[in-house]
């Protein structure tokens, strides 16, 4: 069976171990109008953002400081590779566990 990938959105797991002061990220391609939903918990508060790049510019529609958990969604305003990113505290390694999923524009 061939397909265009327009099946029901599936949860993708987040399972990261991030060294003290370092970053970890999970990236995915989104089309304009796609909605990315995520849910995570971290072993300690960490800085978290959702970002993408336009040339050399980093665009951060979501930028949260010192969060240990988050559940939210964001609809992409442009087609691009988008990344969920966590920054571990300078003095502490962390683990981040959770999931993400993409709902295509129009719910497909």
Predicted regions mapped to residue ranges:
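Acidic, Ser/Thr/Pro
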Residues: 1-108
């Amino acid at each position: 069976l061939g397909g265009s990938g327009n099946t029901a959105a599936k949860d993708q797991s987040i399972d990261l171990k991030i060294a003290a002061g370092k970053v970890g990220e999970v990236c995915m391609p989104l089309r304009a109008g796609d909605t990315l939903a995520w849910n995570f918990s971290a072993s300690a508060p960490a800085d978290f953002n959702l970002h993408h790049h336009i040339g050399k510019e980093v665009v951060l529609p979501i930028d949260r400081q010192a969060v240990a958990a988050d559940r939210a969604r964001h609809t992409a305003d442009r087609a691009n590779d988008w990344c969920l990113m966590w920054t571990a505290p300078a003095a502490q390694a962390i683990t981040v566990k959770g999931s993400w999923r993409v709902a295509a524009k129009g719910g497909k």
